[in-house]
């Protein structure tokens, strides 16, 4: 009976819990903003008068690009427990992919003669996992206001000018101004 429990505990530690944890993290990263517990500001708008709703809609429409960026950033934020779960999964993967000391001693002679491509890929994956574990996430810089380029005002369509430009016919004024 004890042997069965020990094997079940080992199975859970090696296979069940890391996969369950990875599935929970993957599922929670795809949760939209409203389901993650953050209140939706559009749903909390003041409904007492139609004028306030129109003003709220106007301000939202005027800064639509900024609000879109804010909404996108908030929906993909990762809280502390998600970070902890991701680091745990990455740590499990790095231990699972790390070469064993005994295996390295036995295969040391064979590795000096030739390095298998799968071994190179495994080491590259380990480097990537290590970088993911030690990398501190910094959100991208937000550029709030940019100068708009002044474009020349185009004159309204005039058939005489079009004929002069396209057909080469002198049917309009000598110059535009």
Curated annotation (Swiss-Prot):
InterPro entries in UniProt: SecM
Location (main, coarse): cytoplasm
Disulfide bonds: none
Key words, A-Z: Cytoplasm, Periplasm, Signal
Signal sequence, start to end: 1-37
Family: Belongs to the SecM family.
Record's protein name: Secretion monitor
Source organism per UniProt: Yersinia pestis
């Amino acid at each position: 009976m004890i042997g069965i429990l020990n094997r079940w505990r080992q199975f859970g530690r090696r296979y069940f819990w890391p996969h369950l944890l990875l599935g929970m993290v993957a599922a929670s990263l795809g949760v939209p903003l409203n389901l993650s517990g953050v209140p939706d500001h559009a749903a909390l708008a003041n409904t007492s008068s139609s004028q306030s709703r129109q003003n709220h809609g106007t301000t939202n429409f005027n800064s639509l690009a900024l609000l879109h960026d804010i909404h996108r950033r908030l929906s993909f934020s990762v809280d502390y427990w998600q970070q902890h779960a991701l680091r745990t999964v990455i740590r499990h993967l790095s231990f699972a992919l790390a070469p064993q000391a005994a295996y390295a001693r036995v295969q040391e002679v064979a590795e000096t003669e030739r390095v298998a491509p799968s071994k190179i890929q495994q080491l590259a994956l380990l480097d990537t996992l290590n970088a993911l574990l030690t990398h501190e996430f910094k959100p991208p810089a937000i550029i709030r206001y940019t100068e708009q380029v002044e474009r020349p005002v185009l004159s309204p369509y005039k058939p005489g000018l079009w004929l002069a430009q396209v057909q080469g016919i002198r049917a309009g004024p000598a110059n535009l101004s």
